[in-house]
Curated annotation (Swiss-Prot):
Its EC number is 6.3.5.3, 3.5.1.2. Part of the FGAM synthase complex composed of 1 PurL, 1 PurQ and 2 PurS subunits. Keywords: ATP-binding, Cytoplasm, Glutamine amidotransferase, Hydrolase, Ligase, Nucleotide-binding, Purine biosynthesis. This is Phosphoribosylformylglycinamidine synthase subunit PurQ. It catalyses: N(2)-formyl-N(1)-(5-phospho-beta-D-ribosyl)glycinamide + L-glutamine + ATP + H2O = 2-formamido-N(1)-(5-O-phospho-beta-D-ribosyl)acetamidine + L-glutamate + ADP + phosphate + H(+); L-glutamine + H2O = L-glutamate + NH4(+). The gene is purQ. InterPro entries: Class_I_gatase-like, PRibForGlyAmidine_synth_PurQ. The active site is at residues 86, 194, 196. Pfam families: GATase_5 (PF13507). Residues 2-221 form the Glutamine amidotransferase type-1 domain. GO terms for cellular component: cytoplasm. It is found in: Cytoplasm. Part of the phosphoribosylformylglycinamidine synthase complex involved in the purines biosynthetic pathway. Catalyzes the ATP-dependent conversion of formylglycinamide ribonucleotide (FGAR) and glutamine to yield formylglycinamidine ribonucleotide (FGAM) and glutamate. The FGAM synthase complex is composed of three subunits. PurQ produces an ammonia molecule by converting glutamine to glutamate. PurL transfers the ammonia molecule to FGAR to form FGAM in an ATP-dependent manner.
Amino acid sequence: MNVGVIVFPGSNCDRDVQWVTAGLLGQSTRMIWHEERDLSGLDLIVVPGGFSYGDYLRCGAIARFSPAMQATVAFAEAGGLVLGICNGFQILTEVGLLPGALVRNRDLHFRCETTPLRVERSDRPWSRTYQQGQILNLPIAHGEGRYHADPATLAALEANGQVLFRYLDNPNGSCNDIAGITNVAGNVLGMMPHPERAAEAIAGSVDGLGLFAGLLEPVAA
């Protein structure tokens, strides 16, 4: 698998993703500066966590206009795998690859903790190493992670099976306890928890490693 990790001014989880994909899983990984447009030869694009462009205006509002993200939209629309983690999830909603928005946490505080979430379906590339209903313990670190959407959008997400991960204790007040969603096709995933921070036992959990490892099988098949 050939992985591309987009790097914005203010990204701070890009190297964590690189360590998982290249260091732990041995996959070719290229860091893509936000001004680049060339995504040729890549199987997976990761839009990592951090504070792109300082979170000015609002999280992801400026990053959506970057050349790399415009190329990512085309990549996703052609069926390429795209993963947005934390700030990356916010950016994916800003560019319209995923519905809804991420807004201030219900308690107005930055939440940095490990939280349990449930796998809602295991028939997506992202969740193929998990079982439906399995509980994962993943870290969160965000101030604007509360997923919000209008009732019609929420109903569509549920009807289409687009909710992939759901909080058990909803630390931020997200609608329908949503922690991660896909697009209808399933090739784009946005999630607020950080799987790349739960990939080694020394970090306290390996529950996130399966998300990345599971992507290797469909590409190699």
